[in-house]
A protein has these predicted regions:
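Nucleotidyltransferase catalytic core that binds NTPs
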Residues: 1-188
Length: 188
């Protein structure tokens, strides 16, 4: 029986905290194929700080994720035909019997409920498993405490030092500034 592991997330904007989700996705896959999908969420509602919670479109998230995490470049997928998690599950049903979804704690329960509801209706898998990539510790420093909300706030207030703390070492300072500018323009 063939198995695939997928991660689905907003990554808006990508942060060092997202590497944990990618690492868990790879670890869960073992030798099986795995893919990481940034959602197509863009613009939309405002967060608690009054900023749009999805400042980057999917193609830019893909670009930045690939640049930030080159070890996963071939696993990070930008596919304009996949705009919902249902479409993601439909994509793999012909080639795989089993699928595992890796998601962050903030969306995990919603995804479990939705994906389970639509099995044998919109798509069919013999087994669907779920992996929670973990809960963020808002008080922790570094990747454990990093959130896209913190990054959006740092960008909006032009706090380049704070924004830089949320970036991996693979990103050079000029790229960090470029990403921050993109986030700022998407927040409005």
């Amino acid at each position: 029986m063939k198995r695939v592991v997928v991660a689905w997330g907003r990554f808006n904007p990508p942060t060092i905290g997202h590497q944990k989700l990618m690492d868990i996705t790879k670890q869960t896959a073992g030798g099986d194929p795995f893919f990481i999908y940034p959602t197509h969420s863009f613009g939309g509602k405002k967060d608690d700080n009054g900023f749009k919670s999805n400042p980057l479109p999917a193609d830019r998230k893909h670009f930045w994720l690939s640049k930030m995490f080159p070890q996963y470049r071939n696993n990070i997928i930008y596919d304009t035909s996949i705009k919902t998690i249902i479409q993601l599950f439909q994509k793999y049903q012909a080639d795989y019997d089993d699928i595992v979804l890796v998601a962050g704690d903030d969306q995990y329960n919603d995804y479990v409920r939705m994906v389970t509801t639509y099995n044998n209706k919109e798509y069919t898998y013999r087994n669907i498993d779920f992996v929670n990539a973990g809960k963020r510790d808002k008080k922790a420093a570094g990747a454990e405490g990093m959130s896209a909300t913190k990054m959006r706030y740092a960008a909006a207030t032009m706090a380049i030092g704070e924004f830089s703390l949320g970036m991996p070492k693979t990103l050079k300072e000029d790229d960090i500034i470029k990403l921050m500018v993109e986030v700022v323009s998407g927040l409005k």
